[in-house]
Amino acid sequence: MVRATGTRMGLLLPIILALAIGSSAAGISSNDPCYFEGKPRKCLPSFVNAAYGNPVQASSVCGAQQPERYCELLRDGNAGECRSCEQQRYGPAALTDLNNPSNVTCWRSGAVNVPHDPDSAPPDNVTLTLSLGKKYELTYISLSFCPRSPRPDSLAIFKSSDFGQTWQPFQFYSSQCQKFYGRPDRAKISKFNEQEARCINSQHDTGGAAQRFAFNTLEGRPSANDLDSSLVLQDWVTATDIRVVFHRLELPPQLLKVKNANAFSDEMGGSREEDEDDDADLELDGEQDEYDYNLQDNDSADAGYDEYEEPKKHLELDDDHLHLDYASDGESVVKRQGKHKGSAYEKHYQSKLAATTPPQQPPKVTPPGKVTPPSTAAPSAAASAVTLPISQHYAVSDFAVGGRCKCNGHASECVATVSSGSGTALSDQDDGQDEDTPSAPSLANHFGRSTQMSAKLTMTCACKHNTAGPECERCKPFYFDRPWGRATDNDANECKMCQCNGHARRCRFNLELYKLSGRVSGGVCYNCQHDTTGRYCHYCREGYYRDATKPPNHRKVCKRCDCHPVGSTGKTCNHLSGQCPCKEGVTGLTCNRCARGYQQTRSHVAPCIKVPTNANMIQAESAGGGGGGGTGDYKDGGGSQVEEMKKYCGKCKASPKKLNLNKFCMEDYAILAKVIGHDRASQDISTEKFSIERQNEIYKYEINIQTIFKRNPMSGTTSSLLGRGNMMLLVPRKSIECQCPKIKLNKSYLILGRDSEAAPGYLAIGPSSVVLEWKDEWSLRMKRFQRRARKCS
């Protein structure tokens, strides 16, 4: 039993080793998710936060030029503890670092003036631009806001798929979508507008204060469940860069109430009745202490705010261009004609504060940058209003982008590559980045403090399935036998190698040939080497012919024709047989000798001339024992030879030249073939049924079979193996001399014969064969014979 087991293991060991070597040679790991049991299948990279560790460019940073004062905003709308901010502490690096709820890091923008009339004030245009460094297919975008800070009321999210060259709307948020962005709230998405950006009410159907905005890129899109088949949605979720534009802050009702109360003073010409109405409205708004934001999927549109001649009812957005102007120091700059409408209000507000507020000591600054307001005794209502700031800051703690590295289903991972150079991925889209803001996806520079880049970190798909490119978006060189396609659950669309038989290193794809092949093969080889040509480098070029003794991929499969310069009519030969085109009376593979019945001359025009043939010549040649074709060699006396020849030729010429159904049924095969070459047999061919003892008694003709009208259904016979292409036809010498049949080169013939008259692998002309020069009008008759052949008994 042990011996039997050992024997069995000894037999299995070579198989196991062969499988292991084959798997290793193919470069396919057993744990590769892109293959299953050696067959390709769809694979995807891991789902990641694509924003983590990537640089963010901010148009405004709190304390960028000098330390600024900001105050926390309490839930009741009053100002809380005030602090001093600097860029190093509140820079954009905090947006994509590790988000730790117990130690929240924040980016804060520069001061944004609280407008007198938020509905008519120009937008703030504070921007954040995130470069992902590569194309990703995004699932969500999330913005988490800092505690005790105002939330944005209106913002727009844009995406770029070409590294910041162009921008496309992705999502809008606003409490007044129609008025501010000119778009309806929660517009319905159909299959006809799946790439349309939507606007979501930032205060709609929320319960409690929202700490973030979350946008699901596919939610509500009809083709979301069949992403592989929707080119529109594939383009929709693809992005290399994300830009967030903050247009307006949402302020607590209490803060707006104080500003409105100070603004509509007697000096501004307001009436008591209007003030009472406004106060009543503000009191209604003030009943809400918490502010909620809708967490819905969002789409964006490009925002162009170059000039503001006067306040508009809503912002007009251009979906093709995003016009944003930034100063070189990173502060946002908005071009306007005339003064800001809020500037007059601010001067009035400050003068009113000075008139109603008792003198105070300057605030004391205590570490770490906190600003402590001086204590006052029993402040009045007006004095308490003074503690509220007239400016606020956008504050975001986390900028997350969930998605997968875009690899079109041909890679299971993305790998980081480092290339030398400097500059940013968004060099053409400078958003006024501050000098200390990171400018390339380098983790070391992202958190700190240097702008000099000696290397650039990029992500690239580790492509499988014979694909290449950053997103595996094309077939790798020499794998163009089928078109590139995105991998799906049903088909991995693996790229196939071109079939060039080892004679070419380059190929291209031809769609028409691919369709004609039944969508099997479309590769076309070019620059074929080793004297080959053709789509697959499977033919020999002009002046060469294929050596049948060598495989198609052999470097020397094509041999030079070497046609005789005098005996041949050209330098080219048949690419299969190597037969050169010979002049009249010349024979041989290279046309290097005179045929039987011809004699050599000194003329280059007619190197061989025909010798008159008569009975005496035949008798003399027979008596002399001359061999090798021509009129032949006969053992009987001269008279008997002549009589035998006449008898044979008479029978041949007397045979019927008409074809009928009975004759069609009697033969094993019926073909239409064209004679493309000829040569005398160079060796004996002998079988049990077919024997030729002397090589000068047979002629070989190379024919090209064009149509097969009938073949013997019995397997193993020559006719059962017939197919369109080239084949050898054997013709007896006597038939050639009697011109029965009269065979000419480059002519087509209808040939009917029997398998018993030929050696296996050949066709032969025998006593029962029929050879007729083809006429086009016979096509209908042959089709009729084919239909009626079933009745052959």
Curated annotation (Swiss-Prot):
Domain Laminin EGF-like: residue ranges: 405-497, 498-560, 561-610
Disulfide bonds: 405-414, 407-461, 463-472, 475-495, 498-507, 500-525, 528-537, 540-558, 561-573, 563-580, 582-591, 594-608, 649-738, 652-740, 665-792
Sorted UniProt keywords: Cytoplasm, Disulfide bond, Extracellular matrix, Glycoprotein, Laminin EGF-like domain, Repeat, Secreted, Signal
Pfam families registered for this protein in UniProt: EGF_laminin, EGF_LMN_ATRN, Laminin_N, NTR
Residue ranges of every copy of the Laminin N-terminal domain listed in the record: 39-303
One Gene Ontology term, aspect cellular component: perinuclear region of cytoplasm
Region of interest (Disordered), ranges: 332-378, 420-446
Domain NTR: 649-792
Main location: secreted
Region forming the signal peptide: 1-22
Acidic residues bias locations: 428-437
Protein name: Netrin-B
Upper taxonomic lineage: Eukaryota, Metazoa, Ecdysozoa, Arthropoda, Hexapoda
Ranges of biased composition (kind: Low complexity): 367-378
